[in-house]
């Protein structure tokens, strides 16, 4: 589960090459960064990292720049905010006029966050509020951000399922850690995988359609046989609708 497990496997098997596939937003990037720092400090040559960490702000901007966006507000990701803080989300109300509430994960957290967004909309306010203040500091986890800045660098661009190429939306290993970069060591070619034509995850993410309005929802696309990213992840909107809301198929207007 931990990248340190991959490092341990490399340490215990010096005759084998071990590649850790690093994924996730800023939530998981610090643990990868600390693992790479340890690998460098211990001099473990058979350990490398295939870095596919992504960043939260560029895809949010891409969504907000979409001309067909139909989202009135954002429940901010509490897990990402524990690392980056509340400050990076200020551009949403400042530049796009939409409220943001950073939320915890308990049912009462989510309910309160929705209430806070609705209150902002009702009162004509537009700001970043931090419902998850018991965990999320405004400036984030400074130590984690410092380690990430040392180990990672921004990629020029990165391709997202349903959203296409987004500039500087993902991380690679910095030059100081090139010896542990699997892309460098193994000359990994760039591979493009086209989005399935029937998949409408992009429209779901932008609020253009509800998950159950997708042509393949619940038939060709299920959690067991997912076509799109919104169904692959248990946190995805389509997976949530499939598991908990398949029969609530009426649009609600606020």
Please place each PLM-identified region on the residue numbering.
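Short gly/pro/ser/thr-enriched loop/turn and capping motifs at secondary-structure boundaries
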Residues: 6-7, 26-29, 55-59, 81-83, ...
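A conserved active-site cap/scaffold subdomain adjacent to cofactor or substrate pockets
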Residues: 50, 68-137
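Short, solvent-exposed amphipathic alpha-helical segments in soluble enzyme
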Residues: 34-41, 64-68, 89-95, 116-120, ...
